[in-house]
Structure formats: structure tokens, C-alpha cells
Curated annotation (Swiss-Prot):
Protein's name according to its UniProt entry: Globin-5
Entry's family note: Belongs to the globin family.
Pfam family, one: Globin
Anything else known: Globin V is the major component of the 6 globins found in the Sea lamprey.
Segments crossing the lipid bilayer: none
Lineage: Eukaryota, Metazoa, Chordata, Craniata, Vertebrata
Keywords from the named record: Heme, Iron, Metal-binding, Oxygen transport, Transport
PANTHER family in alphabetical order: CYTOGLOBIN (PTHR46783), CYTOGLOBIN-1-RELATED (PTHR46783:SF1)
Disulfide bonding pattern of the chain: none
Residues the entry annotates as binding heme b: H74, H106
UniProt-listed InterPro entries: Globin, Globin-like_sf, Globin/Proto, Globin_lamprey/hagfish
Length: 150
């Protein structure tokens, strides 16, 4: 299933949740490295997205991005937000509240172009569980909620 950022998706099944937790656990256990790798892959594949991060200005190579404390800090925040979503799969109201709050911050305070949520979600899905429909469904749920303030 391709990742979507509008509309709705079916709830996750118990089997999908189990598979997501299993795929996510090793990624989160090395979240500092995994998060940076994901964010660097996102910026190298979508350089225009970097303009929404003023602190990353002038970081033009993957090596510069990996060494940046600001990149590492933001990568950790992204990984922790996904981890919160994984942890909240059984409480979608809790997940929704957190992600709607995050949407508001990105829309109003940071003025991020929402098209990039889906692009980043695809990088995360490819890294964690390439081609897994359940993980892509979770990423779709996240993207739909992140667009809610736009």
C-alpha cells in the first residue's frame, strides 16, 4: 500500500501491530544512529526540504549532516515521535492528540510544507520495513494527522 497523507486508512489489525513492533524495535534500539541515517537519507534525496531547517543551512554533504549536533537533535525528535505513535497504536486517541499538536507546531510555528511529511514517512518505512503494508499504513496514519492543521 502506498503511503497517503489525506483521507483515512483502515485501523491496524492485531497482526499488523505485532509486525510493526517487531520491525520497529531494532531501529529504535539504535535510535541515535537510525534517526540520523533516516534524516540524512531524506535530505540527500529531497534537498529542497532542508530549506525548512535554518540550522542546517550550509550543510551540503551527508558527512556534514551526520556530524551536525542540530541534525542529530532533530533526528532524535523524529524517531521519538514515531516511537510514540508505535507505542500508541492501541490508543489511537492518544496518538491523534500528540500528532495533531505536532501538526499545529509545524504548520504555524515552523511553516513546513506538508508534502514533506509523506516523503519522510516513505524514507522511514523503507528503512524500517520496506514494502510492509502494515508499517506503510501506520506511516499513512501519521501523515494524515500531521496534515491536520493545514
Amino acid at each position: 500500500m502506498p503511503i497517503v497523507d489525506t483521507g483515512s486508512v483502515a485501523p491496524l489489525s492485531a497482526a499488523e501491530k505485532t509486525k510493526i513492533r517487531s520491525a520497529w524495535a531494532p531501529v529504535y534500539s539504535t535510535y541515535e544512529t537510525s534517526g540520523v541515517d533516516i534524516l540524512v537519507k531524506f535530505f540527500t534525496s529531497t534537498p529542497a526540504a532542508q530549506e525548512f531547517f535554518p540550522k542546517f543551512k550550509g550543510l551540503t554533504t551527508a558527512d556534514q549532516l551526520k556530524k551536525s549536533a542540530d541534525v542529530r537533535w532533530h533526528a532524535e525528535r523524529i524517531i521519538n515521535a514515531v516511537n510514540d505513535a508505535v507505542a500508541s497504536m492501541d490508543d489511537t486517541e492518544k496518538m491523534s492528540m500528540k500528532l495533531r499538536d505536532l501538526s499545529g507546531k509545524h504548520a504555524k510555528s515552523f511553516q513546513v510544507d506538508p508534502q514533506y511529511f509523506k516523503v519522510l514517512a516513505a524514507v522511514i518505512a523503507d528503512t524500517v520495513a520496506a514494502g510492509d503494508a502494515g508499517f506503510e499504513k501506520l506511516m499513512s496514519m501519521i501523515c494524515i494527522l500531521l496534515r491536520s492543521a493545514y
